């Protein structure tokens, strides 16, 4: 009888140890997706040939309303910082995926996305959005008249909300770039008029 009890305890111990090992593997996989993947300085060095200027776009009510619609949340900030060299701009967004923020940076040139990077990923799932093969889909995307992307971005199983977050950030970057370029044209026209 003791031998039967002893073997039963042995089976239960092995089952318990296996459970802990599997739990550890799942936890490590989850934690492996969380982390800092690129610094802002590194991103700017990658997308600009010369050191970009840090600039500020002051947001009026109309721009804030547009951003609120695009980002699907109330955007209450009065200004947004961006980086610029010539016609190229870079924008950083800190948007919620499923539960936690995803810090992403998007470079735009000539009204097209030229680079997307995940600076910091804090979600426990959906980390595949940081992969180059996924982010490359955004390159050359432009903004339609209805503020949508001109390219279809393929989703990732288990990362639906992270993908939507990056889509919204990409649209916001394109819209903000468009606003900055329009402001430049208006300022240049005013300068030309005042010179006459």
Stretches found by the model and what they are:
Residues 2-3, 15, 64:
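Compositionally biased, low-complexity segments
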Residues 16-24:
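Sec-dependent N-terminal signal peptides
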Residues 31-153, 159-164, 168-196:
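Flexible, solvent-exposed loop/hinge segments and secondary-structure transition points
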Residues 19, 29-30:
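Cleavable N-terminal signal peptides
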Residues 5-6, 18:
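Intrinsically disordered, low-complexity segments enriched in Ser/Pro/Gly/Ala and basic residues
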Residues 10-16:
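Positively charged n-region of N-terminal signal peptides that target proteins for export
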């Amino acid at each position: 009888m003791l031998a039967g009890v002893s073997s039963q305890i042995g089976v239960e111990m092995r089952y318990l140890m296996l459970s802990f090992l599997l739990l550890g593997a799942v936890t490590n996989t989850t934690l492996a997706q969380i982390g800092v993947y690129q610094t802002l300085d590194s991103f700017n060095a990658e997308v600009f040939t010369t050191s970009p200027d840090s600039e500020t776009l002051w947001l009026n009510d109309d721009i804030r309303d547009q951003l609120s619609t695009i980002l699907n949340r109330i955007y209450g900030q009065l200004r947004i910082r961006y980086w610029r060299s010539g016609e190229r701009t870079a924008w950083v967004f800190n948007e919620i995926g499923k539960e936690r923020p995803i810090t992403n940076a998007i470079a735009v040139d000539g009204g097209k996305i030229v680079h997307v990077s995940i600076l910091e990923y804090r979600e426990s799932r959906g980390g595949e959005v940081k992969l180059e093969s996924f982010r490359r889909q955004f390159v050359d995307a432009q903004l339609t008249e209805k503020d949508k992307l001109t390219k279809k971005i393929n989703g990732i199983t288990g990362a639906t909300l992270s993908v939507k977050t990056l889509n919204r950030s990409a649209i916001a970057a394109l819209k903000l770039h468009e606003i900055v370029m329009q402001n430049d044209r208006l300022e240049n026209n005013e300068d030309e008029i005042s010179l006459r």
